[in-house]
Amino acid sequence: MQAALTAFFVLLFSLLSLLGIAANGFIVLVLGREWLRYGRLLPLDMILISLGASRFCLQLVGTVHNFYYSAQKVEYSGGLGRQFFHLHWHFLNSATFWFCSWLSVLFCVKIANITHSTFLWLKWRFPGWVPWLLLGSVLISFIITLLFFWVNYPVYQEFLIRKFSGNMTYKWNTRIETYYFPSLKLVIWSIPFSVFLVSIMLLINSLRRHTQRMQHNGHSLQDPSTQAHTRALKSLISFLILYALSFLSLIIDAAKFISMQNDFYWPWQIAVYLCISVHPFILIFSNLKLRSVFSQLLLLARGFWVA
């Protein structure tokens, strides 16, 4: 029974990974083609293609890592393979968190109806900052990854050359992984998460008040404008839930509560990668350009299937 349940979660994780890789790859291909055609991208498209690329790579790295260690039965407490994976995983996770934050800020300054002078100034200036913010996010993520490697490398170097006894190696790994890294990661990931949370809550509150004002002025729930605002609210709330779930999952994952030998490992991996697999579809269906290309592909696939 346990083996069948594990197989079910492995299959579900595989399906989720394939969908995430396909959706993020689709976003990158569509916007990349437009970039090559016109030589430039709008600020929103810059963030979307950056977010799609980082999520595509993150999902790919995570999937390969999970199945490699599952198949090889490699001990998860150390080794060069783990170092190689964590370097890429930390970099891509950090970049993805920052890109999501800038996406929420851009949505906020473009859509939210706030009349404060600082917000109006930010509304005018922020789109021009987007390329530099994306580049800065990549540099920050790279520096953070190097710091993690610099702190972690001496311990694993000692582990590899077997200078520590087995008990000492275990104590070092447990102490660093369980007590030091989670707090450090919490501090680092809390910065983009706070930016995301503030901007998304401002936007949700602004849309909610605007929708209530429209209903108070006699607009029915079936009014196209009211429905558009309602859909936007639902999309933002789902983004908030998925992002918060991803943040909490990564913090708990950093604490190493669930190892690869644990029965709940595969369900937990589904929770960790849920946001980067599901949210791309929300972006596709809420973006006119992406939705149009996606609909054309569905029509082509349907015509091919019927033929």
Curated annotation (Swiss-Prot):
It is a multi-pass membrane protein. Residues 29-40, 110-129, 205-234, 286-307 are cytoplasmic. Coiled coil: none annotated. One of its GO terms (cellular component) is membrane. The chain crosses the membrane at residues 8-28, 41-61, 89-109, 130-150, 184-204, 235-255, 265-285. Expressed in subsets of taste receptor cells of the tongue and exclusively in gustducin-positive cells. Disulfide bonds: none annotated. It comes from the Eukaryota. Keywords: G-protein coupled receptor, Glycoprotein, Membrane, Receptor, Sensory transduction, Taste, Transducer, Transmembrane, Transmembrane helix. Residues 1-7, 62-88, 151-183, 256-264 are extracellular. InterPro entries: TAS2R. Its main location: membrane. Belongs to the G-protein coupled receptor T2R family. Most taste cells may be activated by a limited number of bitter compounds; individual taste cells can discriminate among bitter stimuli. This is Taste receptor type 2 member 41. It comes from Homo sapiens. The lineage of its organism: Eukaryota, Metazoa, Chordata, Craniata, Vertebrata. The gene is TAS2R41.
